[in-house]
Amino acid sequence: MTIAIYAGSFDPVTNGHIDVLKGALRLADQVIVAIGMHPGKKPLFSFDERVALIEVSAKAVLHKDAARVSVIAFDGLVIDAARKHGAQLMVRGLRDGTDLDYEMQMAGMNGTMAPELQTVFLPADPAVRTITATLVRQIASMGGDIKPFVPVAVAAALNTKFKS
């Protein structure tokens, strides 16, 4: 069985993340969405909220394939989380050349530390290429319409966060 790990902060999960997740499911039997926990960062959504939003969004978009997705937390190196969960592939989404430059550096470092783990780059669909979680949070905080950029449940959760 092929297991892929897809790591990020997912604060919040966006349509771009879901696009990468769909691509990962075409490559692997099981995809682990690994939410990085950084003690120095204060995310908008708690870990439990992010797990719930990823799971609800996956079910809404992926239907029966959502059963092939699990969500975990990790702190430290993603290669350690990948090893712990038996992943052979590390999936990374690419929006543009800037992402590619950064991800190539990371793939090189990860490849040196974990040669058994293959990094796979998935180019973003043009329809979601401009979406970032940071921009989504900024737009939502200013009362803008974020529905084109995030799953329905995420839009509702963001609207609730910024109305309170």
From Swiss-Prot:
GO molecular function, one term: pantetheine-phosphate adenylyltransferase activity
Record's catalysed reaction(s): (R)-4'-phosphopantetheine + ATP + H(+) = 3'-dephospho-CoA + diphosphate
Keyword Cell membrane: no
Assembly behavior: Homohexamer.
Binding site for substrate: S9, K41, V78, R92
Name this protein carries in UniProt: Phosphopantetheine adenylyltransferase
Pfam families reported for this sequence: CTP_transf_like (PF01467)
Cofactors (names): Mg(2+)
Residues that, per the record, bind ATP: S9, F10, H17, G93, L94, R95, E103, V128, R129, T130, I131, T132, A133, T134
Gene Ontology cellular component list: cytoplasm
Keywords: ATP-binding, Coenzyme A biosynthesis, Cytoplasm, Magnesium, Nucleotide-binding, Nucleotidyltransferase, Transferase
Known pathway: Cofactor biosynthesis; coenzyme A biosynthesis; CoA from (R)-pantothenate: step 4/5
InterPro entries named in the record: Cyt_trans-like (IPR004821), PPAT (IPR001980), Rossmann-like_a/b/a_fold (IPR014729)
Lineage, top ranks: Bacteria, Pseudomonadati, Pseudomonadota, Alphaproteobacteria, Hyphomicrobiales
Site (Transition state stabilizer): H17
Family the entry assigns: Belongs to the bacterial CoaD family.
GO process annotations (BP): coenzyme A biosynthetic process
Major location category of this protein: cytoplasm
Keyword flag Metal-binding: no
EC number: 2.7.7.3
Protein task: Reversibly transfers an adenylyl group from ATP to 4'-phosphopantetheine, yielding dephospho-CoA (dPCoA) and pyrophosphate.
Subcellular location: Cytoplasm
NCBIfam families on file: coaD_prev_kdtB, cyt_tran_rel
